[in-house]
Amino acid sequence: MSEGNTVEPVQVPITGTLDLHGFLPAEVKELVDEYLSTCLEMGIPQGRIIHGKGIGTLREIVHSQLRKNPSVQSFALGDGNSGGWGATSFALKMNND
């Protein structure tokens, strides 16, 4: 690959919100799993995943990943102040060692 084609990874700060706008459904499973793992590592006990309202494809993938993840204590669609049905709030089981 020539120097002009090299893509450098970008370090993105992890907060309590993951915005999936612009990502393809095929990318979402891995993104959600990595995000939840990072939240656990950083001690972020709860957060929100913005999947958009659309036809629900990303929402279904996000909810499926949250259901499968043993570190997830609970999750629900956002309320009126946190994105409504275009976002999902979650709580993690924090390891208090």
Label every PLM stretch briefly.
Residues 1-97:
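Long, charged, low-complexity intrinsically disordered regions
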